[in-house]
Amino acid sequence: MAKLTVKDVDLKGKKVLVRVDFNVPLKDGVITNDNRITAALPTIKYIIEQGGRAILFSHLGRVKEEADKEGKSLAPVAADLAAKLGQDVVFPGVTRGAKLEEAINALEDGQVLLVENTRFEDVDGKKESKNDEELGKYWASLGDGIFVNDAFGTAHRAHASNVGISANVEKAVAGFLLENEIAYIQEAVETPERPFVAILGGSKVSDKIGVIENLLEKADKVLIGGGMTYTFYKAQGIEIGNSLVEEDKLDVAKDLLEKSNGKLILPVDSKEANAFAGYTEVRDTEGEAVSEGFLGLDIGPKSIAKFDEALTGAKTVVWNGPMGVFENPDFQAGTIGVMDAIVKQPGVKSIIGGGDSAAAAINLGRADKFSWISTGGGASMELLEGKVLPGLAALTEK
């Protein structure tokens, strides 16, 4: 990566601004999944071990109006982070003003401060999300000219707390998490060890058109599963019953199939049910066609075997999107089968592109078997699509 990293700058005695991704799920004020906090620890620990004063910025959820602030404070995150670091985390509970400035100026070397949810600034004119120039300058002024971006999950957004701060500091550098994310995903797509197999699931073709097009050029095989299977089926005149379909994307699906030169591999059967919820019958289809009055909710056993075969000998695998409605035990066999087929390949570099796939690997007990699980769904999708990420582009060149 041709950008400066946190190891390229002197941090001792400096107020170091750090964009992290602490957008964690909360239920009744309790964090239900702390992976993103854990993922940021190496960078935070490095800064404080080097004698820097870490000033952390993160968003949490969407905030459009005053009422949306309810339950979106980063206070529970500050407490969790303090426990993980084994030291106090200063939390003034504001995004600007004298209280914040005084707390920052009182910091000593090796201390950590967490600014309140950056999206609280969206209540008055979307200042964070629209990269308000004044806000970016203000936040940049709170530090000593060094900004560390370690939030891969928001790297595809141009916000005040990443791109805005970057534009107003002497040095904007990558943290360890951002550096690793870019290295794993970009290298897998641009310079993969072959055979390189991509697996794309999820419900909508529309979400993955750019990704499929880019990966058809780069990968040796592209396996398709999940709900978008049925748009590809219908584009070929295959009966899909009541399965999910994007009627306005049938031509796109047809076009992708025609120009794929046989690289695009579709399921050959499905697990179908007579309703999405409250179903009374679940069965495997004979072939591709889904029965009238039924809908496909997972790939079937023949497809699992076909995908297993397609993955044999793979040296690089990128997976984004589950094969079915994995949250329901009746429709998780496809996702489990594909995961197991990936991780059993000897010497494979296996990467999960965040989002639902990451949740599936964690929930189904396979997370530790993968080489890398991305912390950013949208950002990893844009990298897989070959796009430039604004948060990365804004960093200082080496």
Swiss-Prot record:
It is found in: Cytoplasm. Substrate binds at residues 21-23, 36, 59-62, 119, 157. SUPFAM superfamilies: Phosphoglycerate kinase. PROSITE patterns: PGLYCERATE_KINASE. One of its GO terms (molecular function) is ADP binding. GO terms for biological process: gluconeogenesis; glycolytic process. It catalyses: (2R)-3-phosphoglycerate + ATP = (2R)-3-phospho-glyceroyl phosphate + ADP. Pathway: Carbohydrate degradation; glycolysis; pyruvate from D-glyceraldehyde 3-phosphate: step 2/5. One of its GO terms (cellular component) is cytosol. It comes from the Bacteria. ATP binds at residues 208, 296, 327, 354-357. Keywords: ATP-binding, Cytoplasm, Glycolysis, Kinase, Nucleotide-binding, Transferase. Its EC number is 2.7.2.3. The keyword Transmembrane helix does not apply. It holds the Pfam family PGK. The keyword Nucleotide-binding applies. It is an enzyme of class 2 (transferase). HAMAP family: Phosphoglyc_kinase (MF_00145). Monomer. Belongs to the phosphoglycerate kinase family. This is Phosphoglycerate kinase. The gene is pgk.
